[in-house]
Regions:
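Regulatory modules associated with amino-acid/nitrogen control
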Residues: 1-253
């Protein structure tokens, strides 16, 4: 049982109130095994935990990233997505959980074009090194997105993108957090640009759920201001909305 392991106290608290989103994604044995690994890592290491595994059911690689957030309330998600983008990964789905006051437990399902030419273990270790560097050295330069080379005709003309980007704020569901929903067309490094924009605007991401379907992406963020208050000011909402729309329109390098 978990009680028989010398686990990090924050992990014990996490286990007492395990989010349903994590329970649905794992069998009990797999979840306990992962929690043991995370607990042992957090007990012996001050830095973040990063591990990956090929998920055949999703045709993707699932990365689990766990860290004590400490005083860092802004920019963690942005650094993770930038690290993935720098490695040439496309994020298909993500669940970002804030547990208690200090522990972040994030899961990402990514498409990795290099996996066919590489041993999965070495490739996953390489990606985790980039992620760990980005998180454990928060003052380091943000990883640079990998340049995407496009062949002629591979890029959809802007006229094909018929639906406008939508950015919605919901302050009715919760009184302590704002639900920020975003719907747009996917492109390389998009999530990295979105999360970087939120970080620059001092928007704190408490929870995130990312889904892609064909060429479209739906992002749902539970967010607050730096002081923990919901984002209710209409002018601030408009500033965030305009910045996100500009980030979506940012040309791919």
């Amino acid at each position: 049982s978990l009680a028989e392991k010398e686990l990090d106290p924050s992990l014990i608290e996490f286990a007492k109130d395990m989010p349903l989103s994590l329970l649905r994604q794992h069998s009990t044995d797999d979840l306990i095994h992962e929690m043991h690994q995370v607990g042992e890592w957090l007990t012996d290491n001050p830095g973040c935990y990063c591990a990956g595994a090929v998920d055949p059911a999703a045709s993707a690689v699932r990365y689990t990233i766990v860290l004590r957030q400490g005083e860092r309330r802004v920019g963690v998600f942005a650094r993770i997505t930038a690290a993935f983008s720098a490695c040439g990964l496309s994020i298909m789905r993500a669940n970002v959980e804030t547990v208690g006051e200090d522990l972040l437990w994030d899961q990402f399902w990514v498409n990795d074009p290099e996996l066919k030419q590489r041993q999965p273990e070495s490739r996953i270790e390489e990606v985790c090194r980039v992620v760990t560097k980005a998180l454990d050295d928060p003052d380091s330069v943000m990883p640079t997105p990998r340049r995407v080379w496009q062949t002629q005709g591979s890029k959809e003309p802007s006229s094909v993108l018929l639906l406008p980007t939508k950015v919605l704020f919901d302050n009715d569901t919760f009184d302590h957090q704002t639900i920020l929903s975003m719907f747009t067309y996917d492109r390389p490094s998009l999530l990295s640009d979105i999360s970087g924009t939120l970080s620059q605007l001092d928007v704190v991401i408490q929870f995130a759920k990312i889904d892609t379907h064909l060429d479209q992406i739906a992002d749902v963020f539970y967010v607050t201001n730096l002081d923990g208050s919901p984002i209710t000011d209409s002018d601030r909402q408009e500033t965030i909305r305009n910045a996100l729309v500009d980030a979506v329109r940012k040309p791919v390098p």
